[in-house]
């Protein structure tokens, strides 16, 4: 059935800016597919956002962004802003709700969950990050018990950070890539890559440490959010041959990463998913990641990459040394399980679940059953 769906993106920055990380990536990839399938799709986003495709409407909203939840303390209080873009985005959604069959927020914002019962149109929530702030977790818990059919996560590992959620019964949406846009590269250069926002919780210094030990060139790509953190990495590891490419479009990023022997994922927090992981795999680049969070469900240890203990630089270094033992074709095969079509299928099931509800959560057992929590 064709649906009219209104999405609300992250309020931290415009679509296309890189500030919203994986939330942006997912919406930019997903909404054109849903529109081509005949759904009427729109997005509420901060002003300055790009349009994912001509058939996806974007409501542009002015306002001040909220603080980053990714760097918050657990006891951070909830503060509403009179000129806040988050507040104005949900105000707009309430004004236009009669034009839509479902409203889907991709967020980790207290206000979004609080407002759920005040809408006439069903509101679904895709929790965008792992448990971070106590007050936000509490409102999620309250609304989850009231509206259990209205919640989804990115991965089982993310769901497991919330003690009131059963990872095996909560729908995990994962992510998706347009495989046609990713060319397999069997013969990369002897370089390593790292792709994420330049921010302390992403653990860039660990990639610097490995590059210095092995004297390998390091390609770094991502939004520069914390210049002081970047400067500190440079100062601590002055001998690293590092190239900072900035925040790149999909095609340029792909050319950089597929030309490296491995991509490192070294987050110092629980990564909810990791779109860059499946993007790297799609080009045949194995991923070496810490064995926690979303990447632990995406990387097949010893097949499409390696999983190592979190913050274990020795293990990370040894995994890079062994990377040429892997068949890069297996990385591409793993990425094929995360096609955009399957991603859109999961979203369509979730949207129907939000509208009608069901005794059973429509999980993707082929992906979720491999997680240790299930």
Where are these regions (language model features)?
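Catalytic cores of nucleotide-sugar-dependent glycosyltransferases that transfer UDP/GDP/TDP-activated
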Residues: 1-374
């Amino acid at each position: 059935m064709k649906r009219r769906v209104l999405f609300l993106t992250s309020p931290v920055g415009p679509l296309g800016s890189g500030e919203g990380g994986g939330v942006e990536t997912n919406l930019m990839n997903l909404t054109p597919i849903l529109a081509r399938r005949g759904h009427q799709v729109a997005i509420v986003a901060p002003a300055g956002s790009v349009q994912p495709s001509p058939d996806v409407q974007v409501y542009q909203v002015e306002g001040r962004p909220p603080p980053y939840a990714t760097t918050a303390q657990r006891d951070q209080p909830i503060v509403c802003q009179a000129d806040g873009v988050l507040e104005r985005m949900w105000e707009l959604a309430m004004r236009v709700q009669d034009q839509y069959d479902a409203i889907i927020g991709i967020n980790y914002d207290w206000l979004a969950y609080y407002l759920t019962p005040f809408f006439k149109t069903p509101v679904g929530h895709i929790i965008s990050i792992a448990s971070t702030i106590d007050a936000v977790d509490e409102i999620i818990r309250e609304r989850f018990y009231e509206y259990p059919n209205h919640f989804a996560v990115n991965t089982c590992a993310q769901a497991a950070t919330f003690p009131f959620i059963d990872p095996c019964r909560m729908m995990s949406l994962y992510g998706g890539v347009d495989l046609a846009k990713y060319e397999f590269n069997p013969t990369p250069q002897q370089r390593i890559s790292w792709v994420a926002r330049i921010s302390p919780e992403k653990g860039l210094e660990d990639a610097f440490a490995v590059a210095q030990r092995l004297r390998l060139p390091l390609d770094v790509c991502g939004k520069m959010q914390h210049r002081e953190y970047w400067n500190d990495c440079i100062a601590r590891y002055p001998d690293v041959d590092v190239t900072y490419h900035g925040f790149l479009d999909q095609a340029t990023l792909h050319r950089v990463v597929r030309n490296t022997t491995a991509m490192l994922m070294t987050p110092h927090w629980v990564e909810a998913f990791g779109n860059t992981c499946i993007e790297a795999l799609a080009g045949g680049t194995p991923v070496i990641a810490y064995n926690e969070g979303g990447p632990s469900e995406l990387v097949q240890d010893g097949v499409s990459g390696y999983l190592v203990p979190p913050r274990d630089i020795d293990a990370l270094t040894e995994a890079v040394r062994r990377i040429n033992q892997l068949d890069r074709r297996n990385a591409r095969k793993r990425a094929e399980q995360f096609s955009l079509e399957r991603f859109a299928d999961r979203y369509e099931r979730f949207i129907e679940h939000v509208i009608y509800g069901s005794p059973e959560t429509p999980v993707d057992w082929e992906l979720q059953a491999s997680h240790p929590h299930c």
